Curated annotation (Swiss-Prot):
A single GO cellular-component term on record: plasma membrane
Topology in the lipid bilayer: Multi-pass membrane protein
Subcellular localization(s) per the UniProt record: Cell inner membrane
A Pfam family per the record: ThrE_2
Role played: Involved in succinate export with YjjP. Both proteins are required for export.
Upper lineage: Bacteria, Pseudomonadati, Pseudomonadota, Gammaproteobacteria, Enterobacterales
Family membership noted in the UniProt record: Belongs to the ThrE exporter (TC 2.A.79) family.
Subunit structure: The transporter is composed of YjjB and YjjP.
Main subcellular localisation: membrane
Protein name: Probable succinate transporter subunit YjjB
Transmembrane segments: 8-28, 50-70, 87-107, 129-149
Entry keyword set: Cell inner membrane, Cell membrane, Membrane, Transmembrane, Transmembrane helix, Transport
Length: 157
């Protein structure tokens, strides 16, 4: 993949990630003045995850690093715009949730209940379930760590 193709794929990924970020921000009743920042933060988070995955990191660690970046930027923006950090960060990480692997795990569970146990179905179920669980854990821990670091009252040493 050349540089131009990568930049076009990155721009497409970021634009398509901004759309659900704004949609979920509207569902969560985020103020209108903050919607564009939710879209930008969702695009930054998903784009950074794509860059990390392209550079060779797996999806779990890429999601963890991207959610830490989203949390850090959200805390900084909350200071600038006098809003709670969750206004920006929660809607921004929604596009990174593992819908495909969770859906595949659920379909495998339904097939096992209908057709009975088979080893390929069980492998598919466990692989996708563990991937989805790891990504959700990476999102939640990655969002909470910047708050623990930046709001710390005691000295670090």
């Amino acid at each position: 993949m050349g540089v131009i193709e990568f930049l076009l794929a990155l721009a497409q990924d970021m634009i398509l990630a901004a759309i659900p970020a704004v949609g979920f921000a509207m569902v969560f009743n985020v103020p209108v003045r903050a919607l564009r920042w939710c879209a930008l933060l969702g695009a930054i988070g998903h784009g950074s995850r794509m860059i990390l995955m392209t550079s060779g990191l797996n999806i779990e660690w890429s999601t963890f690093m991207a959610s830490m970046l989203v949390g850090t930027i959200g805390i900084q923006w909350s200071r600038w715009y006098l809003a709670h950090p969750k206004v920006f960060t929660v809607a921004a990480v929604i596009p990174m949730f593992p819908g495909i692997s969770a859906y595949t795990a659920m379909i495998s569970a339904v097939k096992i209940s209908q057709l009975g146990y088979s080893e390929p179905l069980m492998i598919t179920l466990l692989t996708n379930f563990l991937t989805a669980s790891s990504i959700v854990g990476a999102l939640s821990i990655g969002l909470s760590i910047p708050g623990l670091w930046l709001y710390r009252k005691r000295p670090r040493v």
